[in-house]
Amino acid sequence: MSSFSTHNFVAIATFVCWFCCLATAAPLTSKAAYLLKRNSLIEEDASRKLGAKIVLTNEEKVLDDFILAEKRKLIDDSRLNQTEYMPAASFYRSKDFIDTTFAYKIIQDMPKGGALHLHDLAIASLDWVVKNATYRDNVYMCMDKDNDVNLRVLQLIPPDPFCVWKLVATERANSGDVEAFDDWLKKNISYLSTDPVTQYATVDSVWVRFNKYFAQVIGLLFYAPIMRDYYRQALEEFRADNVQYIELRSQLFGFFELDGTVHDAEFGLNLYKSVTEEFQREYPDFIGAKIILSGLRFKSQEEILNEVKIAMDLHKKYPDFFLGYDLVGQEDPNFSLLHYLDALLYPSIQNPPYRLPYFFHAAETNWQETEVDYNLADALLLNTTRVGHGFALIKHPRFTELAKENGVAVEVNPISNQILGLVRDVRNHALVPLIADDYPIVISSDDPGAWEASPLSHDFYVALMDLCGRDTALTFLKQLALNSIRYSAMSDTEKVAAKAKWTTQWDKFVKTSVEGLKPHINDRS
């Protein structure tokens, strides 16, 4: 091409680009054209949110309309009248309100798929712990210096001048009012006996109380016969809440017998396995449960390496039930994933390399550019299957891109995040932008027993009312249920079977719900 023609080409191309930019930026000539452009922009934005690809059936649309009617009224009443929006308030205050709503009742009835982020000592209700577990033989209690009750199963009473052990049965009988005693005991253990949002000024002070809960119950619930029944009760409660599948993080080590025998991790895994299999035989509609070994992030590097080796052995021996390894506990004051790097790399440096799945808690924090939120970098580089909490993920655009590219879902636990001090008003949850852009998200409940939440329905309700917009309801809820199967650690074959079971229950739920709404449909028509 000649120099002259090259210059002409460049000039023409420049003019075309300038003209196109001018046309794009030019003011719209009419209000109608402006509104058309505005609607198009809003629709394009909405098309990217979680659940936007779901196409509802006619029956589902009926149900969606009823949920949206209540949701919009609550939002509009609060926004226009400047009154408190209760679904986003402290769970301590909002729980009773939530329980009265139409949307919550629908969510309770709705098959929600799986709960993928749960911990072993807070999965069944405190009502069961108090009314069943503390009524067993050899259950003792003592009051510590803070007047908190500690519970243990004991054969021999240890001398302890700071916490004198007394038989619970005797204390209950001597109280003169069994119901009042049990109510007092439950309130003493429950994290919801006060409002954590106003009671605790910092995240650290919240965690002091949270860790106290585990100290109060571990000596009771780790007694092997009680743990067996406690886990069975948890499965009953999750199934009653229309949850079909769970993935449970458990320490596995330390279940004990009355004679002082302390069991290893394989015993703990087999306890869960036998109860799960028995439960599935009794309830074939229940998809199942699987276990993740959780180490504590204040342990030594040598202890974590030993746990990783045990996790490898369990994964080889029980590949269909044992999923992998995680590190749990408050991230801010404890060791980072990088601190344990040699231990966590151990499986990959074997010959041949062994792929031990990881399910790391990472960035459960409000801080930025610290070793805590940089746990995300290590979690992703160590090929974590999912990220627990991931509260600070949105602050790291490259981490966010990498996680989405690799299909690494975030396990969001909205009530837990509020109760543990990360967000007061759940509408301001850090991960709302990811939900608005259809990032891989699952909703779980973390430790529902500790704060008297339902197994999963309360968290689904809070997610519906606070984490997505005014015009979003059943598409969002349905996508969350589907995500819980898609991003579970089940095999591909298991996922196909799980989705089939879930679909059967979903279709039945929609039909039954719409049938129940028919009188109200007629009233509205």
Swiss-Prot record:
- Attached carbohydrates are found at 81, 132, 188, 334
Provide GO CC annotations from the record: extracellular space
Molecular function terms from GO: adenosine deaminase activity; metal ion binding
The residue range of the signal peptide is: 1-25
Q: Where does Zn(2+) bind?
A: 117, 119, 361, 446
| Keyword set, alphabetical order | Disulfide bond, Glycoprotein, Hydrolase, Metal-binding, Secreted, Signal, Zinc
Enzyme Commission identifier(s): 3.5.4.4
Question: Binding of substrate: at which residues?
Answer: 120, 207-214, 329, 447
Record field: catalytic activity: adenosine + H2O + H(+) = inosine + NH4(+)
Active site per UniProt:
364, 389
Q: By its UniProt entry, which InterPro entries does this protein fall under?
A: A_deaminase_dom (IPR001365), A_deaminase_N (IPR013659), ADGF (IPR006331), Ado/ade_deaminase (IPR006330), Metal_Hydrolase (IPR032466)
- A single GO BP annotation from the record? adenosine catabolic process
Q: Does the keyword Cytoplasm belong to this entry?
A: no
Q: Which Gene3D superfamilies match?
A: Metal-dependent hydrolases
Q: What does this protein do?
A: Adenosine deaminase that may contribute to the degradation of extracellular adenosine, a signaling molecule that controls a variety of cellular responses. May play a role in the regulation of cell proliferation.
* Family per record: Belongs to the metallo-dependent hydrolases superfamily. Adenosine and AMP deaminases family. ADGF subfamily.
Task: Tell me the protein's name.
Answer: Adenosine deaminase AGSA
Q: What is the species listed in this Swiss-Prot or TrEMBL entry?
A: Aplysia californica
